[in-house]
């Protein structure tokens, strides 16, 4: 069976130049040496100068727009990754979607693993802003999937209705969703579904292709928060991730629907552990156990996940680099949510608030989706513990307000150096 490096070379002729870097560096998950990536990086010829092509970002509120200057654009606009992915393709979703006045989005995506190296002059400062000061040029990311290290992890179920942990993983050697061809997307599905067939015990389940579901079946899974929504988000469509929908997309879940894998949405895969109630410790234990098993099954079939020591696990959006992890709860906070200090409390705890149905949805019956804001620079264990401690603080605030007592804004958490 061909190894991942030979698969990578056969899938991408332009990467044959990288063979000089040595297959071992890829197989071990070590970042490709910049000089090797540059050797395989292409240049494209333009009819007009960069100044004529520079996008109008004056009214934009996203990280890309904050860091893309005319000079940076001029230096990067003619470069391509070994698969032909360009700077303009990276930023198009941020150009087309200026952002929310109060929510600063990332505004750019990667088309392949090499994107983060070829266009590092723009991606690195965006990553640093989005990830609370994490500098990918000088810092290293830590992975820790030892669920036994979690303290507490049992929420008061009068407040917490459900608990969930998710991450994303990308198959090395295949383009990411914004850039992948139909054949690559189908190959992702084949590789992942074949590996998942090896899951046993409480993780055993089956795969459901979207193309084989009825509209009613799809909608029921969406309403039950098991399946990703249809690709109507302008962030997805502008980035090219809705192409050929629903070809090679689907959901795999175990028999209890407590361990799920999304295939070919925003990322090659999204791995999810979830259940009703407040037992976050059990949810995380299942997540770690299942994720380790999935990675082992992928590797046994001659493939591996995209990873390097600076950026952790490589995913489509820079916001999900590192762990790719979002640990969240649906929590009822009728009093705290109306307190003017609520946003600052969340900010200092490095927590993120979404509506009951996720991004860009309202809170129903004062139920919010609360999760970790950071993904990179802290391990999975650290982030889940941060959510446990932070949500318990929010619940304590809610209890105090119920009793007519005052609450306080906690001091901001400091980003650790790695």
UniProtKB/Swiss-Prot annotation:
This is Creatine kinase U-type, mitochondrial. Its main location: mitochondrion. Residues 1-39 form a transit peptide. GO terms for cellular component: mitochondrial inner membrane; mitochondrial inner-outer membrane contact site; mitochondrion; perikaryon. One of its GO terms (biological process) is negative regulation of apoptotic process. It catalyses: creatine + ATP = N-phosphocreatine + ADP + H(+). Residues 46-132 form the Phosphagen kinase N-terminal domain.
